[in-house]
Amino acid sequence: AGKNESDPETGNLTGGLEGRDTEVQGKTTRQVMKDLAESRPSLGYAPTRDLPKLTAGDQMGVHYSGQSQISIGARFAYEAARLAGKDTGSVRSGRYDLPLGSPDAWMNRKMPGKNVCVWNVASSVKPSLVSGGVKLFGIRVEDPAVKTVIVRSKGSSGDRLVIGPGGIRLAEGKNLQLRTNVQLAGRQSWNIPGGSAVEIKPSPVQEKAMPVRLSGQAEVHVTQAEGGGETVEAARVVLEQVLPSALKCSWTLSGKVEMTLKGMEGKAVNLGKVFVKQGAVLNLNGSRPVAGSVVNQGGMVNP
């Protein structure tokens, strides 16, 4: 009794749920489960060492049958968090083959409506696809297996991702890459840790990288997330080959935020008003914003 027994399929150890990452045959539990998730697309990915965090405050615990640990998948993690009263939002499922407009692309078919959309340990390691128009109230990247969550066009020039007032929030060490047309809606905050980035980049349309159309009516406040310690790295926003289209927007860059325009050298660019606060940086890289659109309020604007 009390002896740790290894599950031959997942590599999990019974009794190994104390936040430590154990090692099985030279691989950590996390590596074993990541390999398993990648080899079997139908499975979600939820490392056992993350379950105590997901189940904090509830009485579900983890059940055993003799010396074998019951298999715990992404749906268990989702349900545990839901039963614990946590705001799980709409959690991205492991069905990366389905576009975000499909109910099965979300845990328990909980489609985004007024829910913030979450990428976490239950989510796929593969890019998420946008087919047609997809409306998300907001995006929260918590602790997926990958450092960079990619949301990209399925390949049509009409694909479009709408980001609403829920804005964007990234966990420390995580990045978000949007490779599809983007429409911004409402007053929203982008909360980005130092060293992390939100990138809007060319989308693959018929195997060609096409400029991204940026549209909508919004007021975007970009701030560096608190709690990053004494990090000297900026929170970054990168707009690469972006084509504003009927865009009515204002951007407020707070301290320790850096916005960079790429691939638009010599081109006139109308992103709306961009307020560069003290401690913020705007890199134009040769692009030519509309006269009067950049308002420097104590920050740095590099031509």
Question: What are the roles of these predicted feature ranges?
Answer:
Residues 235, 249, 253-257, 272, ...:
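Glycine- and acidic-residue-biased ligand/ion/polar-headgroup-sensing regions
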Residues 89-207, 221-224, 238-245, 249-250, ...:
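Solvent-exposed adhesion/ligand-recognition segments of exported proteins
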Residues 290-303:
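Leucine-rich solenoid repeat scaffolds
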Residues 1-88:
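Cell-envelope and extracellular/periplasmic
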Residues 198, 258-263:
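Right-handed beta-helix
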Residues 1-2, 33, 76, 106, ...:
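Residue-level detector of buried hydrophobic side-chain packing
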